[in-house]
């Protein structure tokens, strides 16, 4: 049985390693994928099920990341081995709890933004775009750097105060 911490943290087995490190798994093909979708049937139980499933699968597959959510938006970053991230994204596209799935960023990286998190949950309290901004099309105008910057800011916030 696989046990995943309820807070979404993971261990360091999947963090990028340097070649030649004794006993470590080297992951040289780290893909970072960010997508946005609209929740279908958003409530606490649905969100809990999504997070539990994501943390279980991500721990198994060496994926880390974060899910920013509220009733009108899911914004998620996945990072890990290319094949595994691609498979996870394909599952998300097929998942009927997500509507209007749109890929915003898909790039190779050497370092993870969330190396310690199988799936960080952030309830989008204040730092994500407002509902009015979303309705006005902020995502259509946002650059990949803008979207990545949101997650880098979240990572800095979590690393500064992990209890927040």
Predicted regions and their residues:
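Charge-rich, low-complexity N-terminal segments
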Residues: 2-8, 12-164
